[in-house]
Amino acid sequence: MNDLQIEIEKIFKEAERIWDSQKYGDLKTLWDEDDPNPFYLAEEQADWKIGWDDLRKYWEPLPGKRMLEAIRMRFYDIKIKSLSDEYVFAVGWVRHDMKMRGPIKAWGGDARINALFRKKKEGWKFIAYAESHKTPVIYMQELYGKWLKIP
């Protein structure tokens, strides 16, 4: 594994730690705060969050209050492509498991991710991030593939 791969994976590990802590506002520390318009798309969102106001409202809709009883995010199978000395593109997967407060049952799933990073003095920082779930057709194909084959 090369040094750049290790550096990018460390950022994802820190994101996992922050999600686990439920101090979502701390995610901002992983982003290029000089970028006026960061892009963010979570798989459950209908549209992009663009700009710091949108990101803050997504990460901390009610500052100091937690709607989740527990959350666990795990990034895996990260692959990177250096675009220049200043930019790196990354793809991979995220596994999320969460439990909302109240009677709602826990749930989880896997989603594809991609991210764009910019090199800063203090290291690599996110400038864009997106999650994309599989389509229903792909889910069905995978389910059919798991069925026992009947002769």
Model regions and ranges:
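A solvent-exposed, acidic/Ser-Thr-rich amphipathic alpha-helical stretch
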Residues: 6, 24-86, 107
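A short hydrophobic beta-strand element
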Residues: 86-98
